Amino acid sequence: MFMQAFRAPFPATSNNVCSAHADGCDGASVKPIPDFAVIVPMHNEEASVGTLVGEIVAACRPVGDFEIVVVDDASSDGTVGAVLSLADDYPMLRLVRHDRQGGQSAAIHSGVQAARAPIVCMLDGDGQNPPDNLPTLLGPLLSATAPQRLGLVAGQRVGRRDTLAKRLSSRFANQLRARILKDGTRDTGCGLKAFRRDAYLALPYFDHHHRYFPALFSRDGWQVAHVDVTHRPRLHGNSHYTNIGRALVGIYDLIGVAWLLRRRKRSNWAETFITETSP
């Protein structure tokens, strides 16, 4: 059984994809396009891999054909080995590897580039986003009656299982962002989101852009839906972020996104077909 995998210089490029165990491209094969892809960014999450992948598979099997794209953001522990060890049990599992750490937005971007499905869902690799929420996120986008311009379904956490300091800082940041960007989102930091792949790839790409998906999708004329999702403590290890570090970066990001929204020029177009007429 082969695992689909590739090692990519950061940022990843889609033409690096091969179907192979580890990094080689021997035994390449073409598989049918799945209905949706689940992107899981990971950095030093060795202890969480097995449980999280198993939960994703259990949640997604009733929904449709899918692939799981784990993006290893240059982990220094055994995350890669833990993913490779699951290859025989989960043929839908793929592995993308950064050659140097790029952060969560870079990992999401690489995963979406590598994904083959038209609909993409993402969740954090630390296990705090319970995978049983995935069908709720995917349902509106996979429905036969889905609105044509529905581009993003964003999760909003209910009953967050974080420290008091983290919850308070997040609440302040969300209120400030909502006031400035007017994106109608209560919890833009939630890692559970589902979206159209083509819509995502047309967004401006920058570090930390995953925190501003509702505003960015709306900027491009897409409809955004929100659903409540559950939350739980990390499965293992500690957070890779600090409240102070996130706040300092967030100020600059917020200013930049506000500038992007103001500078957006949108116009509707339609092609007029010209037919040849006889002289």
Regions found by a protein language model. Name each.
Residues F66-V69, V80-A114:
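Conserved donor nucleotide-binding strand/loop of the catalytic core
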Residues M42, V71-D73, H98:
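Conserved sequence signature across two-component system core domains
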Residues D72-G81, G127:
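A conserved acidic beta->alpha catalytic loop
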Residues E45-C60:
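Short, well-formed alpha-helical segments that are part of the catalytic scaffolds
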Residues V96-A114, I119-M122, Q128-R211, R232-Y252, ...:
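Acceptor/aglycone-binding surface of glycosyltransferases and processive sugar-polymer synthases
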Residues F2-I33, K182, D207-P279:
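Hydrophobic helical membrane-anchoring modules
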Residues E45-S48, S75, Q104, P130:
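Donor nucleotide-sugar binding loop of glycosyltransferases
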Residues D35-A37, E67:
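Cell-envelope/extracellular polymer assembly enzymes that use nucleotide-activated donors
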